[in-house]
A protein has these predicted regions:
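C-terminal ends of transmembrane alpha-helices
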Residues: 7, 29-33, 81-84, 88
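Pore- and pathway-forming membrane helices of multi-pass small-molecule/ion transporters and channels
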Residues: 1-31
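Long, hydrophobic alpha-helical segments that serve as membrane-spanning/inserting helices
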Residues: 41-100, 119-181
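Conserved short aromatic-hydrophobic micro-motifs
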Residues: 22, 78, 113-116
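All-alpha amphipathic helical-bundle segments outside canonical DNA-binding/catalytic cores
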Residues: 98-108
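Alpha-helical scaffolding flanking metal-ion-dependent phosphate/phosphodiester catalytic sites
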Residues: 106-121
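Membrane-interfacial segments
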Residues: 33-41
Length: 181
């Protein structure tokens, strides 16, 4: 049978409205359902990085065998999630992520901690500086004599440890007050 022109028009309009509604619903579903998870996963992942870097640093300071594998797994996961966040920040309708400056800070702190952990893990330093021995005591109940006469390697080692501690404090500050479901 032949459709009248008004039927065709009605059908076409319906299809267009249906498509537009479908697109809007799709965008909203994506916005409200998939997006927050990437962000939450990133924050949780950053917290795991913090915990495992803390563990690694403790191993280093106590002179134990250092195992970076868990930290590196967490780092890889945080990096992957951060890249997804960056992608989401570039898509339209993502007002929530327009400024991922805090996430960028978190990621760069984790990366800085990572680099320095790699460095000190491979060093054979014998002595703590006064600052590092104080921090080791405060944070890990580690009583370690400090030396005021440090050789070059000890100085470099302590320098990196101090930075790791500083970055870890900054990281903790960034992530601990974020509300995640």
């Amino acid at each position: 049978g032949f459709c009248s022109n008004s039927d065709k028009f009605y059908y076409a309009t319906n299809r267009i409205i249906g498509t537009v509604i479908g697109i809007i619903v799709g965008v909203l579903v994506n916005y409200f359902i998939s997006s927050p998870n990437v962000w939450e996963d990133f924050i949780l992942s950053a917290r795991s990085c913090y915990r495992s870097s803390n563990l690694v640093l403790k191993q280093i300071l106590f002179g134990e065998k250092v195992d970076l594998s868990e930290f590196n797994r967490e780092l890889a996961s945080a990096t992957k999630l951060y890249k997804l966040l960056e992608k989401e920040a570039d898509t339209p309708f993502q007002y929530r992520y327009k400024k991922i400056s805090r996430e960028k800070r978190i990621m760069s702190l984790i990366e800085s901690i990572s680099v320095r952990l790699e460095v000190v893990e491979n060093m054979n330093a014998d002595h703590f500086s006064f600052e590092v021995s104080q921090e080791a005591l405060k944070r890990y109940d580690l009583e370690e004599e400090y030396s005021s006469d440090l050789d070059v390697e000890d100085r470099v080692y302590n320098y990196h440890i101090e930075y790791i501690l500083k970055y870890m404090d900054q990281l903790k500050e960034e992530i601990e007050n974020i509300k995640v479901k």
